[in-house]
Amino acid sequence: MSGPKWHSPITQIHNHTVLFRAGGFVVATYGPMMAIALFFGFAQGAWFLEYSGGDGGWMARFSLLAVFPAVVIGCRLASLMLDLDELRKNPLRAILKPGFMLQGGIIGGASAMLVGASMKGIDPLLLLDTAAFTMPLSEALGRLGCHIYGCCWGRPTHSVPGLRYRDRDSKVLRCRPELHNVPLHAAPLYTSLVSLGLLAAFTMMLEMPRNLGVYAATYLCVHPILRFGLEHFRDDDRGRLGSLTHSKMYAILLFIAGCAVFYVSGSHGVLAQFDPSVSFWSTAREQFWPLF
């Protein structure tokens, strides 16, 4: 007996890669999902900085004008590092081919935050904390986009109910057509759930006594550990160095950076300030939304 019809759009959303077509112009569902992730991430950043005694309006503007391009460039450059052969043979095709890598975006976004801290005269640990606080929600929403687009797909599985991709437009079937209708681990959804757990932990830490830099250090140390575990479910062996995938190598670098930030945070010894009266929704409405 077939299940109820109402849940089909939810359970089969990964088989609706294309949102709409207009002539030769294609809009993938991934695009709006990433826009939602970025909107909430940048709105969160404006709120967190204002909550911490900073200028939320400046954070909103800086996010759109500097952090956003830095994240996109970082994601794209990290992805291109895995296509060096094609980049040498056909540079234009390699550059125009879609592909992004989260760890590159983390590096790009953190670099932009450090530049912004220098320009604005803000403690760099505060801006790194701001970036770190936005990451779990942004990644949770962004991985839903990956789930729908069919990128970052999981390994074949028979131990748990798997996702079956049937939409020929999905990236997994364009890259690996033999995986059509094969049950796969829902790797992007696993990441979304783990990210929501990290968001819950970060939210509980908000009013706890802590030094500046603790959020950034925690994210940079915890994210790689989680990524190492999740790599077991992903079907991506590109850029291997021995037993390490490219994602694991980036994760090791981020973990080392996190340990360094923990050291600086402890040496710095500046307690984080916060104002519980600052509302996320009012900050988003007053500081972020008017920019659109």
Predicted feature residues:
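Hydrophobic, membrane-interfacing alpha helices
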Residues: M1-F292
